[in-house]
Swiss-Prot record:
ATP binds at residues 10-11, 18, 93-95, 103, 127-133. CDD domains: PPAT (cd02163). This is Phosphopantetheine adenylyltransferase. The keyword Nucleotidyltransferase applies. The keyword Plastid does not apply. Homohexamer.
Amino acid sequence: MQRIAVVPGSFDPVTLGHLDVIRRAARLYDQLVVLVVHNPGKTPMLPLEDRVDLIERVIRDAGLPATVRVDSWGAGLLVDYCRQVGATVLVKGVRSQLDVAYETPMALVNRDLADVETVMLLPDPAHAHVSSSLVRQVEALGGDVAPYVPAAVAEALAVRRAG
């Protein structure tokens, strides 16, 4: 039986921390779906389609195996998507105790609803301080985001800023 895991997130934009979690999760599971989810509580900087395209490019540039794919999910519970693709694990990157506290109740509900386990991966210390919201803030103020995001993302944001 293939072990399928899902790495969900808004990835707005995808960061080096995200890539680190994706890379490590790809070694742990037979198939990995990087799932770009629509969060109705957030107004995204990048449209969903652009985020999917960027993650596909980042995964290709990183040389990750074909067992890693990208998808999107805009409606319904995350566990509904997991059922649809046969995934039994959600992989979440957690940078701090605050992230663990935020993720724990959702992990328990996901296990109750669909017997989907949540695995929390700690970040590479070099990226522990990086978040998409930090990148958005730096970018909005005209700062250099290259230290925090894959090259494809830095290029796309520079093009977007140039107009």
